[in-house]
């Protein structure tokens, strides 16, 4: 089994840190829907400001809020305004399965509005692999 990227929220900003909570990260379900991130899904979080790396699970917050709230122990790893990368992974049988996947990557502005949706594309050819980043237009609002 090979663990590969399935979805990534790149540069989303922390909107709040709530220490007295059971744990997790609270995310806007509309943002999660665009990336394909599910409630209770295990995710890694990398803080671009501090370099801190943690893992937790996702809970959905209020739709349309653009929230990114670190809860419980995770709240100690970030401050409001920090840019983070949130990533979800999946297991595939082996390298031959990588080209059948195209992970979704969302990028954000300073107000957690989605700026672009990208896809990571891996192609197998001539006994090797190539990697490209492709635009994946957002649905009309």
Swiss-Prot record:
Residues modified to Pyruvic acid (Ser): 24
Its PTM note reads:
Is synthesized initially as an inactive proenzyme, which is activated by self-cleavage at a specific serine bond to produce a beta-subunit with a hydroxyl group at its C-terminus and an alpha-subunit with a pyruvoyl group at its N-terminus.
- List localization entries: Cytoplasm
Is Lyase there in the keyword field? yes
Residues annotated to bind substrate: 56, 72-74
Q: What reaction does this catalyse?
A: L-aspartate + H(+) = beta-alanine + CO2
Q: How is the cofactor bound?
A: Binds 1 pyruvoyl group covalently per subunit.
Gene Ontology terms: cellular component: cytosol
Q: Which domain of life is it from?
A: Bacteria
Entry EC no(s)? 4.1.1.11
Q: Which UniProt keywords apply?
A: Autocatalytic cleavage, Cytoplasm, Decarboxylase, Lyase, Pantothenate biosynthesis, Pyruvate, Schiff base, Zymogen
Pathway assignment reads: Cofactor biosynthesis; (R)-pantothenate biosynthesis; beta-alanine from L-aspartate: step 1/1
Q: What class of enzyme is it?
A: lyase
Cofactor (UniProt): pyruvate
UniProt KW Cytoplasm keyword: yes
Q: What is its main location?
A: cytoplasm
Q: Which GO terms describe its biological process?
A: alanine biosynthetic process; pantothenate biosynthetic process
What's a single GO MF annotation on this record? aspartate 1-decarboxylase activity
Q: Which residues form the active site?
A: 24, 57
User: What family does this belong to?
Assistant: Belongs to the PanD family.
Role description: Catalyzes the pyruvoyl-dependent decarboxylation of aspartate to produce beta-alanine.
Assembly and oligomerization: Heterooctamer of four alpha and four beta subunits.
Q: What is this protein called?
A: Aspartate 1-decarboxylase
- Organism (species): Desulfovibrio desulfuricans (strain ATCC 27774 / DSM 6949 / MB)
């Amino acid at each position: 089994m090979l663990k590969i990227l399935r979805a990534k929220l790149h540069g989303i900003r922390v909107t709040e840190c709530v220490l007295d909570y059971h744990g997790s990260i609270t995310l806007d379900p509309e943002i999660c829907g665009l990336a394909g991130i599910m409630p209770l899904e295990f995710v890694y979080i990398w803080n671009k400001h501090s370099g801190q790396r943690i893992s937790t699970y996702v809970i959905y917050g209020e739709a349309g809020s653009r929230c990114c709230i670190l809860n419980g122990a995770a709240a100690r790893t970030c401050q409001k305004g920090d840019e983070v990368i949130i990533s979800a992974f999946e297991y595939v049988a082996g390298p031959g399965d990588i080209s059948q996947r195209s992970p979704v990557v969302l990028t954000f502005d300073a107000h957690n509005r989605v700026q672009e949706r990208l896809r990571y594309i891996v192609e197998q050819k001539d006994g090797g692999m190539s990697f490209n980043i492709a635009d994946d237009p957002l649905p009309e609002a």
